[in-house]
Every structure is written in C-alpha cells, then in structure tokens.
Amino acid sequence: MEETATHNTKISDSAYSNSSNSQSQRSSGSSKSRHSNSSGSSGYCGHGSSIQGSSNEPFPQPSVTKRNKDKEHKKKKLKSSVTTAATATVTSVVTTVSEYTEHENGTSHMSLGVSGTVVPLSGTVAEETEITEAGSEGSVISSHAGVALGAAGVVPATTPGPENEAHQMASLTQTLNSIKKMKKMKDLSTDIPEETEGHSFSLPMVAEEKEEHIRNSFDAEPPAHNEGEFCVVVSMQDGVVVFTTPSITDVVGFPKDMWLGRSFIDFVHPRDRTAFANHITSGVITPLSNSNPKGGSHPGKNSFYCCLRRYRGLKSTGYGVTEKEVSYLPFQLNMTFRELLPHSNPLEVEGNTSPESVPGGCNSMFLVITAKLICSAYKHAGETCASPKFVTRHLATCKLNYVDPECMPYLGYLPHEMLGNSVLDFYHPEDLPFLKEVYQIVMQENGAPFRSKPYRFRSHNGGYILLETEWSSFVNPWSKKLEFVVGQHRVLKGPENADVFMAPVEDDTLQISEEVLKESKIIQEEIRSLLSEMVKNNGHLEKQQMSKRCRDLATFMESLMDDITKPDLKLELPQEEHSFSEHDSVMLGEISPHHDYYDSKSSTETPPSYNQLNYNDNIQRFFESKPKTTLSDESGESKIEANRSLMSTDEEGKSGPAADSSLGSSNRKCCSPVNGSGSGSGSGHSSGSAGIGGSAESRRDTSATNTSHGSYKPPLLTEALLCRHNEDMEKKMVQKHREQRNKGSERESKLKKCVHDKLLQEQCHGVKRSGSHSWEGEVYKASKHPHVEGGKELNPGSGGSGGGGVTSGLSQCLGVAATGKQYSGVGSVPPIFQGGTNVNLWPPFSVTVTPLQPTPPCSTHGFATNNIPTPPHMASMIPVYYIEKRAPNFKNN
C-alpha cells in the first residue's frame, strides 16, 4: 500500500529522527568521501564523551562546507524523538565498550589501541542520499545493543590525511583512558561494600547484562524463516529498537542495523500511530504490574494490524529519493512482552521484583514484535475464488463495531480502518435498493438467519468485489428494538484490480452518475430509519410455525401409539382364553376366535376390523349354541334333532352326518359356560341318529380329553407361537368375511327369485289355501312356544292340501327333499340360508293371518308361516342378523 507523506520527504531515508545535537552524525565533512568516520553510534546520535574530564565536547570536525551548512540547517528544524535515550546512552558508550572490550579478549584490543594501528575494514557504499552509514558489519561491536565499533577506537581505513590521522589518534586515546578507568573501578568494587556502590558503575553493569540477555535470549530462539516475516525487539523504556533479524532486508528493504537505536513508531504509518499507541498502552499494563521474578515472556500475546514503511534506497528508487512518495506495506504484528532481569544484580531479592527496586529495572522490559506481511488474496483481475467466511457486525446506526481480521486479504482494509465507519458507504450505490429489501427481511425474521443474493462491496483500491452474505440480527427483548446486525460473508468474485492494498483511484467515483448517488443517499436514510424502528412481533408466522409443530407432534404420537397398542393387546389375551375351550376351536375347523389382532391385513376393500369380526363371531356362536337354562333334556334333544335334520340336508361338499355331528358337538360345547359344566352338556350324548352318535361322542370325548390333559398346556404357550397363530386366524377370518359377503348376496337373490316364481305359479293355477283355526293357532302357538312338537316332522300335508303343494315346490326350488335328503336335481343351499329365508319372511313379532285374505302380501305371509315347518328354536331368535353373517363357516369348515 503506497501513500503520500509530505512531511517525510525531507527526512533521511534511514528513518532516523535527527536530534538537535546530531553534529557528529557525519564525521567527515568532505563530500567526496563515501565512508563514515564517525566515532559515535548513529543510533545514539554520535556523541562522544571524554572520561578524563567533564567536558562533553564533540570530536574535532573538519571544515564546514556549504553543503554541510544546508544539511545542518535542515536538521535543526526537525524534532528529535530519542533525545532522552541518546543523552542517557552517550554517557555510557565508552564505559560499556571498554567493559565489553576487556571482557572479550580486551588485551588484543588494547594493544591495537596503544600502538595506534588502524584496522582496515572493507567499507560499503551507503545507500542513503543524506546520511552515510558506517557501512561494514565490522564497524559495530554489538548490533544487539546498537553500539558502534568506532567508539572503541577501531575505524575504517581511509585515504591518509592530517584530518583522518588526528581523528584516529583521538579515538584511540579515548579508548585507552576508558579501559584504564574501568580497571580502576573494578578494583575498587572488591574493597567497597555493596551498600556503598554508587550508580556510576551500576549502569554499565545493567547495560552489559541487558546486552547479554538480549543476545542469549533472541539468538537462542530460531529466527522467523517464513517468507515475509521478521522480528524486532523494542525497549519499553524509550521505544527504541534494540534488535532486528536479518530478514527485515528482504521484507521492507532496510539494512539489518538501520533500525537499531531508532524509535519503532517512526516506521509506522501516521494514521496507524494512534491506534498502535493505544494498543501498546492497554497491553503493557499487565506485564508491568505482574512482573515475573525470574524473567521470561508473559503469556499475553496479541495481534495488531498496521502499515510499516518501505525502504527508499538508491537500489529501489534510484536518484531523486526526496521526490518519491513514501510507501507502506500492511503487516500483522504479533506482540509479546518479555522481561529480562540481570542475573548478577546484587540488589535482586526474592519477592522484591518491582521495577523501582531494581536499578535499571525498567530497561529490562522489552516488546518482541513478529511482523508478518499481508498480501492480496487475488492473483489476477476478476478472479473467482471461494474465500473463507468472515464476519462483520454493525449497529442499528449502520456503524461497524466489529470486523474480522480474515477479511484483510480480500477487502484490503485494516480492521481499525473500517471500525466506526458506516457500512452503507461500502455498498455499491446501485445495489442499495436491493439491500433495503434485505434489511426489511432482517426486521421481519426477528433474528432468524437467512441468506441473500450476492451484492457488490467496495475494496480498499476502489474496486468492488461480489459478496454472498448470511444475515442475522439481535433484538432487545425488552425494548423490542434492533441492537446489531451480523453478516457472515463469502467472496464470490474479486475486483478488477487484483492488488486490494493499493491506494484508491479518485477517477473511479466519477463512473457513477449523480442521480444514482443522490438516490443512494435517500435510500441510506431510509435504511437507517428502518433499522431504528421497533421490531413488530409477527404473530401470524408464529402461529403457522406452532400449528406445523403441533401437526408434526400429532403425527409422531399416532405412530407411537400404534406401536404401543400391539403389546397391550397381547397382554389381554390370557384373560380371554379362560372363558373358551380349545375343543371348540378344533371342532370349528381349527379356528380360534379367542384372540384379538391389532393389525388388519385387509385388501383395498377395507373390511371390518378383526376385533369386530371376532366379536360378531363370538355372539353368533353363543346364540347358535342354544343354551339350556330351564328346559328339560327331552326338549333340548328335540331341538337339536330338528336342527340336525335341517342342517344335514344343505351341506355341500361334505357328508351330512359329519357336519351334523360337528354342529351338534359345537352347540353342546357352547352351552358349557351357562350350564357350569367344563365338558359339555350331558344330554348331548344321546342326541342324533344311531349311525353318527357314536362318532360324534368319540370325537367330543377325545377332544375334551386332549384339551384337559395334553394339547392345551398354558406353560408351553410362547409369544412367538401366539403371534403366528393370531396372524393365521386373522387372515382366515378376513377371507371368510369376503366369501360370505359375495356368496351370500348371490344366494339370497337366487332364493328370492325362486320364491317369487312359485308364488306366481300358485296364483296362476288358482290354488286356494284352506285355512283352519288350528293352523292359525299353530302360528300363534309357535311364536309363543318354540319348543312344541309340531316342528318335528317335515310333513307337507300337515298344513292342508294347498299348503303341501307349495311346501313341496319350495323344497324342490331350494334343493331339499321332504325326506331330509339332498336333492340331486337342484343346487344345494346351506341350511343357514333356509333360516335366512325364514328371517326375511318372518316378522319379529307374532302375526295372525286370516285364511280369507286374498291379497298377495298376505298370501306370502300366510304361505311362509304355515307351509314351511319352522324349527321351534328359530321362532324365539330375534337377533338373527348374526346367522346370516356366519353362514359360510359351516360350508368351509
């Protein structure tokens, strides 16, 4: 990022702040010489100090030329940023160097100083146009402390001349005197108690200890080898740079030692200096208040983003440096505070670690900065990329109060550059109408996140990128007003200029018409007004969401209840089994109506449920069992015999005796709950014909024996066997229901047609039925006493001559002979449908018919009630609806 700083164009490119007493920065006044002969460190403004006397005069200077006068005039106008550090350092430069020289093989250096030998060094050409540097690395004894080698009396070799010789002699003499004084002070330190030691030699000890700590601490750590990174150590006392890594030259272009002794904030962009100072002030409070007794780094590591100055040398910009603009590059500064306490300090006491209690304690606090260059994320113009998501947050006033640092490579802005600015200023003016609709949805959703269509967002270089945003918001639950809006962004397309850190071009704003700009201002005000309104609670949407949740819950509960009802039905099964006999199931065709089923595997017709079919079947079987309550055995036998005679004539596909025996046995067994007998009625043993009585009795006895002793063992009944049995029975009962419904309707229509034909034939032949009071009384008597002996025989002549003819004809129509045998000429009809015929023609109450009534309906009733012998047990059965439903059971089984 390049920006113009007009006040820096006159400053030397070395970025050093020139103090008012910087006359010794250039030791040679000759403009022809390229080498620095200064005896003082350029980092500390080059002041020499004489140890023998109290004079602080500078070294002899050459004649001042016109160029030097101009330069000095310019330097006097500039403010000094390190005057305090320079003054404190000048008084200790010689002593520090002398101590270091004596400590590091000082004998050889002293011999050099005494003999006056000049050490030739390979000087380097300075890359500055105003200030020449002591070019070689050998000109500095310790780059970590920023002390020049020239103070020790070692100067680069130059062209012989009287000025150079005088300067060299003065330097060597000063060095020799410094070494002698340091020896004297060291000898006195062994005799003088530690309590009486003055500050005259404590400062050199601190300086030496600081130098050693810096060298040991930062040289032991691996330097930043990552591309675009370098490390800087800044003293927290005066903000002066005391250490840099060699990679600084590759990143910003400055030589390795050019930052030493300079204030770090001078290299920070002017607009970032205030934010940097505030960040350091807030971060340095904790390390100073909670100092580590043993030294070391503090855990508080934080980051700051700012722009650092680039180097303007001859190699990079050529001649005419003052006419070039000062450029800056964006960096991420990872800062750590490090405390270095002198290990040999005699005043260091355990528990007493405050900076005031340690001489020079404040000098031991350093700020370690690792600067990482931030580059643009785009390689070419209009690049389509999938960036990581970054977040911004702005208030209801549209002022940004949080910016994710991840956005810098994509937007080109530093976080503190966007904070406090209106987010509406970054939107494209033509997209503001669409964004107004987006903010309306934000107010309606009441905090629910949603994703909008892409829109354009301005980058630092003036171009626009394409963003896709997922919006959310927070509404104050008490004031019902919007507090802030959060946007999670993702870049879809880069700007036309790939370098987003470049300075914006002013001509880009001219591409948008004035009308669009005016309209955008109006829309911005509307958006601000919209966000300041009270958020309305959308009750309709909430009701819809609530109803949807209720429906989902109801569906879930229904499915859950279906699963729960299955074991509930199974648990009730043992209670129902005690009221029925397994013998009944065997005799009814191995069908057990005792169990209920929870699922009806029906066809598309959706027949009645299995529970309903089972219930109807149980009731029907109860009425068919003809329970004996107050009747005698003889009357029961007569009813069973009459029923057997009817049932045996209409059984198709099976022999009459077998069906009759099965029916009789079933009826007797169904009476067992009423009679209180577990093995059936005792009178049932003598019923039936002689040929089939024995077989029925043997089957009943065998089944009863098996039921009570062998076949039915409750402990052997398992759940798997019960479920399989229930499924089979369910299928069979549903199938019976279908067959009964289909066949029953066909046979009923056939029976009605046959009866209708016989009635028409009777009327055509003029048959007159003779009535008698005895016949009429028989009808009345049959309705009152269903167990009379009149229904014992199927005699067609019992009701009269006319009645007998009709009866025989009807018997032929139904396929039944008068003798009780199956008639071969006509299709057989199950016996239950004979009962069905009686039900259709017999009203549910007693009817007295007059013989002289000539109307066909009366003839129909008279015919039906007089000529067809009615079984005595059928006269009293009113709920005969179940008889018709149960008709196919006798045929299929």
UniProtKB/Swiss-Prot annotation:
Organism of origin: Periplaneta americana
GO CC, any one term: nucleus
Annotated TM spans: none
Residue ranges annotated as motif Nuclear localization signal: 66-77
InterPro entries: PAC, PAS, PAS-like_dom_sf, Period_circadian_regulator
Keywords: Biological rhythms, Nucleus, Phosphoprotein, Repeat
Encoding gene (name): per
Assembly, per entry: Forms a heterodimer with timeless (TIM); the complex then translocates into the nucleus.
Segments of skewed composition (Polar residues): 1-11, 51-65, 600-614
Modification(s) after translation: Phosphorylated with a circadian rhythmicity.
Molecular function per GO: transcription cis-regulatory region binding; transcription corepressor binding
Keyword Nucleotide-binding appears in the UniProt entry: no
Biased composition (Basic residues): 66-79
Feature: compositional bias, Low complexity: 12-50
SMART domains reported for this sequence: PAC (SM00086), PAS (SM00091)
Protein name, per record: Period circadian protein
Disordered: region residues: 1-83, 592-614, 645-716, 731-751, 784-803
Function: Involved in the generation of biological rhythms. The biological cycle depends on the rhythmic formation and nuclear localization of the tim-per complex. Light induces the degradation of tim, which promotes elimination of per. Nuclear activity of the heterodimer coordinatively regulates per and tim transcription negative feedback loop. Behaves as a negative element in circadian transcriptional loop. Does not appear to bind DNA, suggesting indirect transcriptional inhibition.
Domain PAS span(s) in chain numbering: 228-371, 390-493
Top-rank taxon, per record: Eukaryota
This protein's record includes keyword DNA repair: no
Bias type Gly residues, positions: 677-694
Localization per Swiss-Prot or TrEMBL: Nucleus
GO biological-process terms attached to the record: circadian regulation of gene expression; entrainment of circadian clock by photoperiod; negative regulation of transcription by RNA polymerase II
Pfam families: PAS_11
